[in-house]
Amino acid sequence: MAPKQLKKIENPVVSSSEEEESASSGESATSGEESDSSADSPVKESSKKPVVVSKPSGSKTTTKPESSTAAKRSFEKTDEMSKKKSKNSMGEEDVKKKDETLKKNLFVRLFTEEDEAILLQGFLDFATKKENPSDHIDDFYESIKNSISFDVTKPQLVTKIGNLKKKFNGRVSKGLKKGKNEEVMVFSKASDQNCFDLSRKIWGSNGVLYSKSKNMRQVQLGGSVKVDEDDQEPQKHRFVISTLSSGQELVSYLKVENPNSLGVDDTKWSAKLDKIKDGKQKRKMEKNLKKIQAKEEELSMMRSEFVAAVTNVLSKQDNASYSCK
């Protein structure tokens, strides 16, 4: 008979010491696993953190271009607005500069001293050879315009003649107040003396136009009226009742014979202004007088244009009435 083999004990009974060792080893194993897992967990968390950080960083990278473009657009808008404002301000400055230049051009002296002498000499020659240039302003303008240093217009020419006559009358009135006759008045500047002498030959007491005006009144009234004693000396702005045509009456009132048709004699009031003592009140009055003179220049220009238009129409009517007769 074969001997009986002992059955292999699958689960042998472990002693208490072994159990304790196994338990301790199990605990150490579990603690090792836990330590390993705990050691691994920071690595996992650290590996996850970049992912978490990368998401907002990725979102930032995607949103950064949007914020930069928006910032660029806002910057461009502000830049455009600033450019528009600067353009508007520059435009306003240009308009102001243009207005200032226009205002300055109104008071710029166009006629030189040589032009004044040429104009007076031409006026004197025309009046001596023919008739009053004021009654034939178109012919006189055509004869003198090429001799002036600039492209003078007809209203400018008429206005300048009126101003020269007004200047002459003012100098004569000042001289009479000082006890000086127009024939003995002397000026330091040669150009002023020349213009005064030419003006005296035209509008003086023995001037061409003054003597012609007296003869014209006698002829128009049939020569039956005696010349008044007051007519022996030149008078300003005298209104004459005669048989002149309507066009000639209008011209004699509004044109060169009556440059101050508004009734304001600048020379008279400027002479009175000289008698006032220097001070704020006098300076204020002088400024007002300059403003009045500037306005008179504008009105004189308008008056000349009005006279030219009305005279043209009335002369045609007068010619038509004479032809019918």
From Swiss-Prot:
Biased composition (Basic and acidic residues): 73-83
PANTHER family: BNAANNG10740D PROTEIN-RELATED, GLABROUS1 ENHANCER-BINDING PROTEIN-LIKE
GO BP of this protein: regulation of DNA-templated transcription
Segments for region (Disordered): 1-98
Family: Belongs to the GeBP family.
Name of this protein: Probable transcription factor At4g01260
UniProt keyword annotations, A-Z: Transcription, Transcription regulation
InterPro entries in UniProt: GEBP, GeBP-like_DBD
Segments of skewed composition (Low complexity): 23-32, 49-69
Molecular function GO terms recorded: transcription cis-regulatory region binding
Source domain of life: Eukaryota
